């Protein structure tokens, strides 16, 4: 069984049981964003989380070890075609240099970690149209001189 097999099984079960990512996350004690990423194969589960996920979804036993495998974090380098993903790509394209300038002005020369990192998605109801709130929280890592 490979990561893609587990991902496809999870999507099939999620659809069959009419589950949300939030319900799956609650069942295993993680956040919806993190568990979704793990189910898509971009993060590895601890043994405890993998066991809970396999049990909750009724996945085959061999899925546990696959969920615990360290992923190769790679993705298609082509410009995304999905409209939602493309808009995030567009945000980074338009505001990336701005964010870099502001972050480095506040923190110095370095980067925001995507390893020591968390992310949250919230919904804000608004009479002019509901708003998506993305919160990214990454540790600042200064570049070292030697």
From Swiss-Prot:
It holds the Pfam family Cyanate_lyase. Its EC number is 4.2.1.104. Transmembrane segments: none annotated. The keyword Lyase applies. GO terms for molecular function: cyanate hydratase activity; DNA binding. Catalyzes the reaction of cyanate with bicarbonate to produce ammonia and carbon dioxide. NCBIfam families: cynS (TIGR00673), PRK02866.1 (NF002773). This is Cyanate hydratase.
